[in-house]
Amino acid sequence: MNASRTPASATATSSTTSRPRRIAVIGAGIAGLACARTLLQAGHEVHVYERLTQAGGRMRSVSGPYGSFDIGAQFFTVRDPRFQKVLDTTPGNLRAWSLNNIQTRNAHGRRIDKLAPVRETHWVGIPDMQSLPLAWATPLWEAGKLHLGQSVRAMSHHIANGKGQSHHQWSLMLDTEDHGPQIADGFDCVVLAVPAPVAVQLLQTAPQGAALAKSLATVEMAPCWAMTLSYPMAAQAGLSTLGPQWNASRSTHERISWVARESSKPGRAQTERWTIHANPLWSNEHRHDDATRVLSKLQKAFGEITGIRVAPRHASVYLWQNAQTLAPLGQSFAYDRSAGLALCGDWCTGARVEDA
């Protein structure tokens, strides 16, 4: 693996058996990896397929000439003891970010929230957010169970008979980076741990997926433009940072919803760096814009919020096609036992890392 580093459940109609199952998990983000780990611990054979060349999903981090950026999830909190138990398996990959609370500021950088936010620990991965999913993915990779650079474009299903019983058999049609089109087959169940719109597209490739696809009609997800800015000139004598004294803030600016000083996170390079997320509405309106145009507009908005108007030494933008959950499914997962299909992801109940 590249360690350096993009319906209500249907009524069951088939009986269960105690035999270990062969299960395909599509998507190697937090939800897919957590699902795969749990299934492996239960004794099943699991294979995870990820279209990108690295695991992580929306906890992806990217490297720039002056340090790394968490372009997806910025941090996470722990409110469920079950999630805490999972995190306890990789304690060396986490540190607390010194944000006791996160304030909200207007388009001019002035604080506008009236009440003090709830104070809770904001956790980040070390040396970046992607380190957590990479730690979970490494055992799968070493066991030959994680298949990177393999995009699932369709699924097919048939009923197999054996030992007096019938059971599901699923096949996945893959586009691989190294070997072209391939087929992976012999799966008893398929778990789709991908954004809801992607799940719908895959479910529609097999008639058995129609019920689950229909159940996702009310789920809404929005894109997000992410911008990264580097200011190595702030490392000069007598100058340690640029702009405001705060390190992260939500924003009501018409273009921007989140601003964070990346270099304030523990375990990061100290070169002044900022990560910015555009708000969902603006991102959706400009999802087809040229990246250069988006970069110019977001840089202008960033200057209005922070007062930093000097040109960065390095700047980039990235588009997340399905980044933010606007309307969740309303249940923690969906499972059609009669078809051998399941769905999971943060979009099932919310938009937080813990929801995955």
What are these language model-derived features?
Residues R21-Y49:
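N-terminal Rossmann-like FAD-binding beta1-loop-alpha1 element of flavoenzymes
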Residues L40-G64:
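Glycine-rich FAD pyrophosphate-binding loop
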Residues G56, Y66, I183-P244, I308-V310:
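Central helical "cap/lid" subdomain
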Residues S61-Q103:
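N-terminal FAD cofactor-binding segment of flavoenzymes
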Residues F75-P81, R111-A137, H288-V294:
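Short beta-strand to alpha-helix junction loop
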Residues L148-W170:
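A conserved short coil-to-beta-strand element within the FAD-binding core of flavoproteins
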Residues T228-Q236, S240-H286, R293, K297-T306:
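Active-site substrate-recognition segment that forms the wall
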Residues S296-A339:
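Flavin (FAD/FMN) cofactor-binding core of flavoprotein oxidoreductases
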